Amino acid sequence: MICQNAFFIFVYIKTSAIMDKFLIVGLGNPGEKYYNTRHNIGFELLDFICKKHESEFETNRLGQISKISIKGRKVLLLKPNTFMNLSGKSVKYWMLQENIKLKNTLIISDDLNLPLGKIRLRAKGSSGGHNGLENIGQALNSLEYPRLRIGIGNDKNSNQIDFVLGIFNSNEYDIIHSNFDLISKSINSFILSGITITMNNFNN
């Protein structure tokens, strides 16, 4: 009887883990005007992942949505259409709508302080001056959400706003996109193994 109960507990725990949903949010600004800009790297990465899974984005409330599956885990890809500085409204809505836990929500953003193409994963932390991350923290009333920052480099001689809203040159574009496969693997790891293991394996 004890063994039978233990078996059912094991099955319940394993099934519950598989049934967990995940929200992967790529930050950016909607509209052709911002296509291919450094600030929209989150959008571009999600487009890459969506295409890899032979899925498509559909316009929905407060964003574009794509639903995929990764080894039995249900994954919602979200590109907010609220503009970068108001991303929190979209993130909060879809977390509540799909009943997704904070620990299962990964926010992808650009980062001026990281070299081009480098990534940094964190389980929590400050916004680091990123308005999108700041607004999400305000909407969720917490900064304890996992995030993946992608380095876009920096130009000390140019205005930062002009730089992040500028378009990647061909060399930068190639460097960034050559890393997309590795970055998408880090997201798979987050979904399957959690943020701690993923940080240990992918932070570079």
Mark where each language-model region is:
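A hydrophobic, small-residue-rich beta->alpha segment in the mid-to-C-terminal subdomain
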Residues: 168-171
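Gly/charged, well-structured mid-domain segments that form the phosphate/adenylate-handling core
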Residues: 152
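Nucleotide and nucleotide-moiety/phosphate-recognizing core
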Residues: 8, 16-123, 134-148, 156-159, ...
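Short glycine/threonine-rich catalytic loop with a Thr-x-Gly-x-Asp
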Residues: 126
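Hydrophobic alpha-helical segments within soluble ligand-binding/sensing domains
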Residues: 129-132
